[in-house]
A protein has these predicted regions:
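TPR/TPR-like (Sel1-like) alpha-helical repeat modules
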Residues: 232, 368-371, 416-441
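Register position in tetratricopeptide repeats
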Residues: 46, 80-81, 114-115, 148, ...
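Structural marker of alpha-solenoid helical repeat scaffolds
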Residues: 63, 96-98, 130-132, 165, ...
Length: 464
C-alpha cells in the first residue's frame, strides 16, 4: 500500500517518487532537477528497492553527468549490491577531487562500515558531521561502530548525543535500548527515555522503548502502562501488542495476554501471526487444546505458516497423539526444514519417542541457527540435563552464564551438572544465584551435601 511505502517519508518525497514512477519508469517524459533526483534515489536506497534505484541513477547520470552528488549515489548502488571494493574505489577517486565534501565523507563511512572497518568508518562519519547536517543520524552511525568494537560505554554516549540532535530517529532509540541492555545500564536508559517521552509525548517509539526498559528492570506494571500509551498512539503496531501481551504473561495474567494478541488480530494486518502467538502462549501454559485451536486459526489465515504447523505438532504431542504430531511436523519440515520452530518440534517429538540420537541431531541444528531464541536454548539445556549429557551442558551453559551471570536458570542447571561431575568448586561459584526450588527438583542431593548444602541460599518466602 502507498501509505505503508512512505510511512517514514515526507509528502514531498512521496510525490516525487510517485511522479517518477508514473512517468520515467513508464517511458514517459518528465523533468526533475538534481535535488529532486537525489531525493528520489535516496528513497530507493533507504527502502533497498534495487530495480527502480538503478533506473533513477541512470536517468540522473544522463541529465547531470558531472554532478558529484549523482556520482556518490552511483557508488551507493555498488554498496547496495555488496560490491564494496568497487564502491570504495569510486568514492576515493571522488575524494581526491573534493577532499572536504561531507557527503563523500559520510558515504566513505557507510562503505567502511559495510566492510567491517569500524575505526575508519568512525573517522569518516565524524568528518561528515563538520557541516552540522544530520548530526543526529551521523552520531547514531558512530555509536553503531562502537558497538561493533564492543565499546558499549562510548556507544551509549553517542546514542544519547544522537537523540539530543534528532529525537525522532526511531532506529537510534531501538539501538540505544539494546545497548543499554548489553551494558546492564537500563537505569540510565530509563532516565533518558522518561525524559524523552516528556518531551515527545506522542512518540509511539518512545513509549514502546521505555516499556522495553521497564521490562528489563522488572517493573512490569509500568511497562504495561508504557505499552498501553504506545497503542493509544498507534493501534496498528504488531510489536507493541506482542510486548504488551508478554508483560501480561509475566504478571501471570494469561487472559489479558491472550485478549491483547486477539486485539492485534483485529487491528493489524498480521492476523496469522497474532493467532500463532496466542497458540504459543497457551502452549507455554500447557493448555494444548486451546493452543491447537489458535494454531489452526493461524493456518486458516496462512496455510504454509510452518511455525504454526510446528506449534500444532507440539500441541498434538502434548495431547498424546504421536502419529499426528509427527506427520504435522514432517509436513512443516518439507516446506522449511531450517525453521527454528520446526527443528524444535522435531527434536521434542523424537525425544518423546525415545530416539535421543535423532532428537540430538535436531537440537544441534537448532542451536547453531541464527534465529535460535532464548527459549530454544533453555529447552536444549533441559534436554541435555535430562539425558545426563553434563559436559556438553556445562560448555553450553557457561557461555550463557558469562553473558548473564545472575540468570537463575543457567546457574541452577550448572550447579546440578557441576555436582554430578564432582566439580564442587565450580558449583560454589554459581550457587548464590540458583532458583532453590528448581535446584531441589533437579538435584536433591546437593541440598544436604556437607560442603555445598550450606551454600544454597535460603528460599525466599512467598509474597503476600
Amino acid at each position: 500500500m502507498i501509505k505503508d511505502r512512505f510511512e517514514n517519508f515526507d509528502d514531498e518525497v512521496r510525490d516525487l517518487v510517485l511522479e517518477f514512477e508514473r512517468t520515467v519508469l513508464n517511458d514517459g517524459i518528465q523533468f526533475f532537477d538534481v535535488d529532486e533526483l537525489e531525493m528520489i534515489i535516496d528513497y530507493y536506497l533507504e527502502v533497498n528497492d534495487l530495480k527502480p534505484l538503478e533506473a533513477a541513477v541512470a536517468f540522473a547520470e544522463k541529465l547531470y553527468p558531472d554532478s558529484i552528488e549523482v556520482k556518490i549515489r552511483r557508488a551507493h548502488v555498488a554498496i547496495a549490491h555488496q560490491q564494496y571494493s568497487s564502491a570504495l574505489n569510486q568514492l576515493l577517486a571522488l575524494y581526491e577531487k573534493e577532499p572536504g565534501n561531507t557527503d563523500l565523507a559520510y558515504s566513505l563511512g557507510v562503505v567502511y562500515s559495510a566492510m567491517d572497518r569500524p575505526d575508519e568508518a568512525i573517522e569518516q562519519y565524524l568528518a561528515a558531521s563538520a557541516d552540522g547536517w544530520q548530526v543526529g543520524r551521523i552520531y547514531g552511525n558512530v555509536a553503531e561502530e562502537y558497538v561493533k568494537k564492543q565499546d558499549y560505554e562510548t556507544a551509549i554516549k553517542y546514542y544519547e548525543s544522537a537523540l539530543d540532535y534528532d529525537g525522532h530517529d526511531y532506529i537510534t532509540l531501538y539501538n540505544y535500548v539494546d545497548t543499554c541492555e548489553r551494558q546492564r545500564c537500563c537505569g540510565q536508559g530509563r532516565k533518558r527515555l522518561e525524559d524523552y517521552v516528556k518531551r515527545n509525548p506522542y512518540s509511539r517509539d518512545g513509549w514502546f522503548c521505555l516499556g522495553l526498559i521497564y521490562i528489563d528492570l522488572g517493573e512490569i506494571a509500568m511497562a504495561i502502562d508504557a505499552f498501553e500509551y504506545a497503542l493509544a498512539i498507534d493501534k496498528s503496531s504488531s510489536e507493541t501488542y506482542t510486548e504488551l501481551a508478554y508483560a501480561y504473561e509475566l504478571m501471570g495474567d494469561i487472559g489479558r495476554a491472550s485478549s491483547t494478541l486477539l486485539q492485534m488480530a483485529e487491528n493489524t494486518i498480521f492476523r496469522a501471526l497474532a493467532f500463532r502467538r496466542v497458540g504459543q502462549l497457551y502452549l507455554r501454559c500447557g493448555n494444548c487444546n486451546a493452543a491447537s485451536i489458535y494454531f489452526s486459526k493461524a493456518l486458516a489465515e496462512q496455510a504454509e505458516d510452518v511455525s504454526s504447523m510446528a506449534g500444532l505438532a507440539e500441541s498434538y504431542l502434548m495431547m498424546g497423539d504421536m502419529s499426528l504430531a509427527l506427520s504435522t511436523a514432517r509436513k512443516a519440515e518439507s516446506i522449511d526444514g531450517a525453521n527454528v520452530d520446526v527443528l524444535s518440534a522435531m527434536a521434542k517429538i523424537y525425544d518423546a519417542k525415545g530416539d535421543w540420537e535423532k532428537a540430538g541431531t535436531y537440537y544441534d541444528e537448532l542451536i547453531i541457527n541464527d534465529q535460535c531464541t532464548e527459549q530454544h536454548c533453555r529447552e536444549y539445556t533441559d534436554y541435555l540435563f535430562r539425558h545426563r549429557i553434563y559436559d556438553l551442558l556445562i560448555d553450553f551453559s557457561e557461555e550463557s552464564f558469562e553473558a548473564f551471570p545472575e540468570d537463575p536458570f543457567y546457574c541452577t542447571y550448572l550447579a546440578a551438572a557441576y555436582f554430578y561431575t564432582n566439580r564442587y568448586n565450580s558449583a560454589r561459584r554459581v550457587l548464590p544465584f540458583v532458583d532453590v526450588a528448581h535446584l531441589s527438583d533437579l538435584c536433591p542431593e546437593i541440598m544436604t551435601h556437607p560442603l555445598l548444602g550450606p551454600l544454597v541460599p535460603n528460599p525466599q518466602p512467598p509474597e503476600e
